[in-house]
């Protein structure tokens, strides 16, 4: 399944995308400055590369829903792979809501692509079929209603407070700031409650 926006195309990544995909992550600091996560350690990068290989070779990616982000050529066809994005933590093992993420090549920053991706991805994400379920989540994610037993579905985003670009992207997409992560005052948490 693929979808697109005005300047971008999004689709599941294929084995033929692997080399271009790893090139995005071999840049100086694509995760730290462009996405919604903190700088990964060497062991996290090694685990990521191994998981990525499994995804491309065996399609084994259960805890993520991700797509490649491609430029759209003037004729409307798929262009260069410039990053990936989606949601992770779908298994709720850390008692967190699924979190939105994106990573873009440094040379395409500050062109509105991250905002364009997040807005279009959210449109597709919220249109997917749902089932009622029970899960434990962090109280911080519930905002002022942390005492409630039930909550409407939402997406989260953990972002370094130094990452002003990602904060702007998330807020343009409608996410609201909830506070700082416990024990990590440099990391903020944003949430977006389902519009449905």
How would you name each of these model-derived features?
Residues 79, 112, 163:
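Conserved G/P- and acidic residue-centered "switch" motifs that form tight phosphate/ATP-binding loops
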Residues 170:
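Conserved active-site tyrosine of GNAT-family acetyltransferases
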Residues 155-159:
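Conserved hydrophobic beta-strand within the GNAT/NAT acetyltransferase core sheet
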Residues 1-107, 122-152, 176-196:
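GNAT-family acyltransferases
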Residues 38, 160-162:
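Short beta->alpha junction loops/turns
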Residues 117, 163-166:
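Conserved short alpha-helix immediately C-terminal to the canonical SAM/SAH-binding motif I
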Residues 108, 112-121:
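Conserved acetyl-CoA pyrophosphate-binding loop and the N-cap/start of the following alpha-helix
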């Amino acid at each position: 399944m693929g979808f697109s926006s005005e300047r971008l195309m999004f689709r599941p990544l294929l084995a033929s995308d692997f080399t271009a995909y790893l090139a995005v992550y071999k840049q100086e600091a694509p995760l730290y400055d462009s996405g919604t996560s903190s700088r990964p350690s060497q062991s996290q990068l090694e685990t990521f590369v191994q998981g990525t290989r499994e995804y491309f070779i065996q399609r084994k990616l259960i805890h993520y829903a991700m797509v490649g982000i491609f430029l759209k050529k003037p004729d409307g066809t798929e262009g260069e792979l410039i990053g990936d994005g989606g949601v992770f933590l779908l298994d709720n093992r850390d008692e967190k809501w699924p979190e939105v993420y994106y990573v873009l090549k440094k040379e395409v920053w500050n062109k509105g692509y991250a905002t364009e991706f997040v807005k279009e991805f959210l449109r597709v994400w919220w249109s997917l079929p749902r089932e009622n379920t029970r899960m434990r989540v962090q109280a911080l994610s519930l905002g002022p209603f942390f005492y409630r037993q039930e909550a409407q579905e939402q997406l989260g985003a953990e972002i370094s407070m130094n990452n002003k670009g990602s904060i702007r992207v998330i807020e343009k997409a409608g996410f609201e700031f909830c506070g700082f992560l416990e024990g990590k005052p440099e990391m903020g948490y944003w949430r977006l409650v389902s519009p449905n």
